[in-house]
C-alpha cells in the first residue's frame, strides 16, 4: 500500500497545473452473478444473509439438506476476500429449532447473533463469550426494540447502532426502517429513531444493510433494492434512490460487503451478487488519463461527490489521496460508455 500511495502522489505532482475538465463520476452495479455451490443450489430457498466484520464469514438462512427445521442458519468461511466460500456449517440446535430461522445479523465482534423467525415478528438474540464458544439459546430482544413487530436487523461496523424494520407506532407507511444506538456493546439499546421521510414512505421499507463506513444504507422499498446516502454519520439521510440493478424484480435482502465492493441479494429463490465499482472516467471520454487526474486535483480537499471515488466505491466524503490511488489503479484503461440515467 505504501508503494501504491507513493506512486499515486508522484503522479499527482506530475498533473498539478494541467487544465482540468468537467467532472462526471458515480458508481455502478455490475451484472448480477448467481451464487452456486456450496452456498446455493436449485431447491435451496435462501432467506437473508450477512457478512462478518472482516468479510471472511457469510451467515445465511436456507432450507438446504442437513438442517433441523424449515430453514436454518448456516455459516460459510473463506481464507481471503478473493477466495471462494467453503462448505457451510449449520449453527446447531442451540440456534436452530422449530420453525424457520431467517435474516441473520452478526455483530462486528462476532459475539452477538440477531435473527428472525417466521412464527412471529420478534427478533431473537444468541450470544457467545468468544468466537470459539458455543452460542447461547435464543432469547427475544428486549424493549425498546423488541415490541413484537420487528424484523430484519443489521449492525453498524462499530456494533453501536442497530437498523431494523418495524411497523410500530410512528411509521410513515406499512413498515419503516428504524435505528437504535447504545453507548457500548455491553449497554442496552436506546429508544429507536425513525429514519424519516427521506427513507420511509407510505409503502413498505425493510431489509436494511448499512455500509461499514455508515454512509450508505441499502434496503428494500417494495420489490426493488434502493439506497440512501449521507455525508457523514451525523448527517441526515438523502432521499432514497433506486439502485437499478440489472434484472427483473422482485429483489430482496440486500447485504453489502464490509469493503463495499459487492452487494448480495435474493431473487427468484436464489442468491446473487453484484459488484460495485466507482466510475473513474470522470470526464466521460472513455479513457482514464491525466485529464481525469486533473479533475481530482481541481477538487482537492472538497466534498465533491463526483470526484470522491475512494477508498469505498462511493468515496469517504473528501477528495484526497484515496481517490487519486483508486484512479491511478485504472490509469490508461479504456472504459465503456456511461450508463443511461434513469
Residue ranges and their predicted role:
Residues 1-11:
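Bacterial N-terminal signal peptides that target proteins for export
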Residues 9-19:
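Bacterial N-terminal signal peptides
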Amino acid at each position: 500500500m505504501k508503494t501504491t500511495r507513493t506512486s499515486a502522489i508522484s503522479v499527482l505532482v506530475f498533473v498539478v497545473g494541467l487544465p482540468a475538465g468537467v467532472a462526471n463520476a458515480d458508481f455502478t452495479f455490475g451484472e448480477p452473478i448467481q451464487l452456486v455451490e456450496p452456498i446455493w443450489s436449485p431447491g435451496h430457498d435462501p432467506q437473508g444473509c450477512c457478512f462478518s466484520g472482516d468479510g471472511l464469514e457469510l451467515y445465511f438462512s436456507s432450507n438446504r439438506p442437513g438442517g433441523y427445521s424449515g430453514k436454518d442458519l448456516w455459516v460459510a468461511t473463506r481464507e481471503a476476500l478473493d477466495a471462494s466460500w467453503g462448505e457451510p456449517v449449520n449453527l446447531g440446535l442451540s440456534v436452530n429449532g422449530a420453525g424457520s430461522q431467517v435474516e441473520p445479523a452478526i455483530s462486528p465482534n462476532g459475539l452477538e447473533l440477531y435473527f428472525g423467525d417466521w412464527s412471529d415478528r420478534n427478533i431473537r438474540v444468541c450470544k457467545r463469550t468468544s468466537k470459539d464458544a458455543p452460542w447461547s439459546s435464543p432469547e427475544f430482544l428486549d424493549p425498546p426494540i423488541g415490541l413484537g413487530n420487528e424484523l430484519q436487523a443489521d449492525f453498524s461496523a462499530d456494533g453501536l447502532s442497530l437498523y431494523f424494520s418495524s411497523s410500530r407506532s410512528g411509521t410513515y407507511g406499512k413498515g419503516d426502517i428504524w435505528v437504535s444506538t447504545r453507548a457500548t456493546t455491553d449497554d442496552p439499546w436506546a429508544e429507536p429513531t425513525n429514519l424519516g421521510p427521506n427513507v420511509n414512505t407510505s409503502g413498505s421499507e425493510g431489509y436494511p444493510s448499512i455500509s461499514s463506513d455508515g454512509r450508505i444504507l441499502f434496503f428494500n422499498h417494495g420489490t426493488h433494492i434502493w439506497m440512501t446516502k449521507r455525508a457523514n454519520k451525523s448527517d441526515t439521510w438523502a432521499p432514497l434512490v433506486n439502485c437499478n440493478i440489472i434484472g427483473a424484480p422482485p429483489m430482496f435482502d440486500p447485504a453489502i460487503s464490509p469493503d463495499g465492493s459487492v452487494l448480495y441479494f435474493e431473487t427468484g429463490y436464489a442468491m446473487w451478487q453484484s459488484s460495485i465499482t466507482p466510475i473513474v472516467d470522470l470526464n466521460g471520454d472513455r479513457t482514464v488519463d491525466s485529464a481525469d487526474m486533473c479533475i481530482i486535483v481541481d477538487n482537492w480537499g472538497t466534498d465533491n461527490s463526483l470526484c470522491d471515488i475512494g477508498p469505498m466505491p462511493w468515496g469517504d466524503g473528501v477528495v484526497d489521496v484515496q481517490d487519486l490511488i483508486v484512479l491511478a489503479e485504472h490509469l490508461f484503461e479504456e472504459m465503456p460508455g456511461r450508463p443511461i440515467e434513469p
